[in-house]
């Protein structure tokens, strides 16, 4: 029986589907430049640069004003509220610079996490209050997609059934509100890499989480063709002593997705989860070469793993513009190649690209 109360019109569905497919077309992925003021401050502190709005603006200007050919690698950029309204040195809005390159503009809309009482320090996501109005304003101001991040951890009795169900339902509710306002939802249920668990444990938990998320999305009448998934790769915990190859990570990851993610979803854009730039690229490449059916585009939505080398090259100095932009373009191209299974590892002498970017209990 046809749904008695359709959530979206055929025109709304068409627009959402086209935007989602455009973001992940032909090896394109997402630059996650939605770090909060505090998180960006931590990054700047490591290169001994003061955390001021101007310094944050200057670094992001370098990323957004690279050669237009970046649009062959980057299909979308997720911005933080501050960044959506910032301008380059000539007074042009960043969002307009990106749109002129053919890059879709997105926005982070969750408001962080809050404790779930009665659990082992588990959390749920904040930000549903007033979300529809904020979505409408961001859509008016040029955003066409948005991100909502839920955090689940592997620990003693974690993630609990309550945490999985609560976060799945919150992700689904947000996705529905986004779509009602013409924004493609980037659904991000992150099983964080904190801990000493092995890869098999992570796969088990990831499958349980994704199954719950897609059940909730169905319950909330979310149009899957107009969404993208931003999951963790299936990896061992950061403190696990056993090491796994990219091929092992790929097989576990694609198996988990194959068991839980409907083929209607146009694209899966992995988060980097604190991996080094090079490891994030190698794992993505192996995932695309994995000999299992892959009905979705398998791409990237990286923050640290696209920016670490560029940030190190910049060092807060205007004269390092060329080196900064070259470092960013190099990583963007490498990940675009990996999204097509065409990346060739040549060995890296760049310490920034091979350095672990892991931060315990990482928050945006």
Swiss-Prot record:
Residues carrying N-acetylalanine: 2
Record key words, sorted: Acetylation, Cytoplasm, Cytoskeleton, Glycolysis, Lyase, Phosphoprotein, Schiff base
Active-site annotation: 188, 230
Keyword Lyase: yes
Domain of life: Eukaryota
Classification via Pfam families: Glycolytic (PF00274)
GO molecular function annotations of the record: fructose-1-phosphate aldolase activity; fructose-bisphosphate aldolase activity
Gene Ontology annotations for the cellular component aspect, listed alphabetically: centriolar satellite; cytosol
Site (Necessary for preference for fructose 1,6-bisphosphate over fructose 1-phosphate): residue numbering on this chain: 364
Pathway: Carbohydrate degradation; glycolysis; D-glyceraldehyde 3-phosphate and glycerone phosphate from D-glucose: step 4/4; Carbohydrate biosynthesis; gluconeogenesis; Carbohydrate metabolism; fructose metabolism
Post-translational modification Phosphothreonine, affected residues: 39, 119
Subcellular location: Cytoplasm, Cytosol; Cytoplasm, Cytoskeleton, Microtubule organizing center, Centrosome, Centriolar satellite
N6-succinyllysine: residues carrying this PTM: 13, 121, 317
Modified residues (Phosphoserine): 36, 132, 272, 276, 299, 301, 309
Gene3D superfamilies noted in UniProt: Aldolase class I (3.20.20.70)
Annotated catalysed reactions: beta-D-fructose 1,6-bisphosphate = D-glyceraldehyde 3-phosphate + dihydroxyacetone phosphate; beta-D-fructose 1-phosphate = D-glyceraldehyde + dihydroxyacetone phosphate
Anything else known: In vertebrates, 3 forms of this ubiquitous glycolytic enzyme are found, aldolase A in muscle, aldolase B in liver and aldolase C in brain.
Family per record: Belongs to the class I fructose-bisphosphate aldolase family.
Subunit (UniProt): Homotetramer. Interacts with BBS1, BBS2, BBS4 and BBS7. Forms a ternary complex with G6PD and TP53; this interaction is direct.
Name of the molecule in the record: Fructose-bisphosphate aldolase B
Species this protein is from: Ovis aries (Sheep)
